């Protein structure tokens, strides 16, 4: 499992069991296994063999996987656990969508899945946390990604963090903790989740059937789950097409993209290529596995920033062909 690549972080979490805080904030780059760690720790807290498990030492402590608590958690229906995340994230992870409140079904039937955690979700969570535990133990709530909250939702969570119900445990998972309210961060014990050791991550990818794992790991910036997504998903196919176009020098073809779904992968590849060109100029090294071709570092860094902005713009209505052509045309010549 991916959490095996984060043994040191898992050991840190186990070290907090004796004096468990009411809120943890696991933060790090996307794709390093933060959610897997959060879910595994939540499962451990709900494991009905946990009393004997907690007396073991070292990284071998883990949920038993066979008790009712573990089986319910793994099936996604433990009565004392909640995962609070945007509808779009739940859909991408093949989880059941949050149950609509009365009167909400008709309003949401024809709308796109939300990309934010809704205020209704935190209110429902507050109701859940104020009930007695079904199994006589803790109640655990995972927020993922925690930064995907608007101001009203964040303030609702803050209220629960300021006055946590007895035996309630909050686990926040964040790719960008700076986007959280400072008052939320200050009420959590922060646990940084680093990039795994590259050789171990490449070996894990190879075990998942990924070909050329080092290449995909480099392109993903060292994040193994992102590398797995690139190597096995539709996004990876789009990235491959862009990489082949760049390798062949056929940049004009990249500007002929007509499908909106290929715009963000194009912007991502161009951004990472630009960063590699800048890094090569400054240090002779690259970060994302691109060719170490030096150039005007300032120009390539400016282009990388522009592509970062374009990655956000690709979610909005626009002309795919025109937008792609503009991105390619703006590439530095040196």
Describe these PLM feature segments:
Residues 136-140, 165-171:
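Loop/turn-to-beta-strand initiation segments
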Residues 1-61, 166-169, 175-334:
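Charged, glycine-rich active-site and insertion segments that engage polyanionic ligands
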Residues 130, 155-169:
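Conserved catalytic/switch belt of AAA+ P-loop NTPases
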Residues 127, 159, 182, 186:
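Conserved adenine-binding aromatic site and its adjacent loop/helix in ATP-hydrolyzing domains
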Residues 1-152:
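Clamp-loader machinery-focused feature within the broader ASCE/P-loop NTPase space
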Residues 148-149, 163, 179:
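Residues immediately C-terminal
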Residues 151-155, 321:
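Conserved strand-to-helix beginnings and helix N-cap segments that scaffold or border functional pockets
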């Amino acid at each position: 499992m991916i959490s095996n690549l984060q043994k040191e972080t898992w050991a840190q979490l186990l070290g907090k069991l004796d004096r468990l805080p009411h809120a943890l904030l696991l933060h790090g780059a996307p794709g390093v296994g933060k959610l897997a760690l959060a879910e595994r720790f939540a499962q451990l807290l709900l494991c009905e063999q946990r009393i004997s498990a907690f007396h073991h030492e070292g990284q071998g402590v883990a949920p038993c996987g066979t008790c009712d608590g573990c089986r319910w958690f793994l099936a996604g229906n433990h009565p004392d656990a909640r995962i609070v995340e945007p509808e779009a994230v739940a859909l991408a992870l093949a989880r059941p969508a949050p149950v609509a409140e009365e009167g909400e079904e008709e309003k949401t039937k024809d709308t796109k899945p939300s990309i934010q955690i809704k205020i209704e979700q935190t209110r429902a969570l507050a109701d859940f946390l104020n009930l007695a535990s079904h199994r006589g133990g803790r109640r655990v709530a995972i927020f993922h990604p925690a930064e995907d909250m608007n101001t009203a939702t964040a303030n609702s969570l803050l209220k629960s963090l300021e006055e946590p119900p007895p035996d309630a445990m909050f686990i926040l998972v964040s790719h960008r903790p700076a986007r959280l309210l400072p008052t939320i961060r200050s009420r959590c014990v922060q646990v940084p989740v680093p990039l795994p050791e590259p050789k171990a991550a490449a070996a894990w990818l190879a075990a998942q059937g990924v070909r050329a794992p080092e290449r995909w790991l480099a392109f993903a910036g060292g994040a193994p789950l992102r590398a797995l997504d690139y190597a096995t998903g539709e996004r990876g196919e789009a990235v491959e097409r862009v990489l082949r176009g760049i390798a062949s020098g056929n940049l004009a073809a990249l500007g002929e993209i007509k499908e909106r779904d290929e715009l963000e992968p194009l912007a991502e590849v161009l951004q990472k290529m630009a960063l590699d060109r800048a890094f090569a100029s400054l240090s002779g090294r690259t970060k994302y596995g691109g060719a170490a071709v030096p150039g005007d570092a300032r120009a390539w860094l400016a282009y990388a920033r522009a592509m970062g902005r374009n990655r956000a713009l690709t979610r909005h209505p626009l002309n795919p062909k025109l937008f792609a052509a503009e991105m390619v045309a703006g590439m530095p010549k040196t």
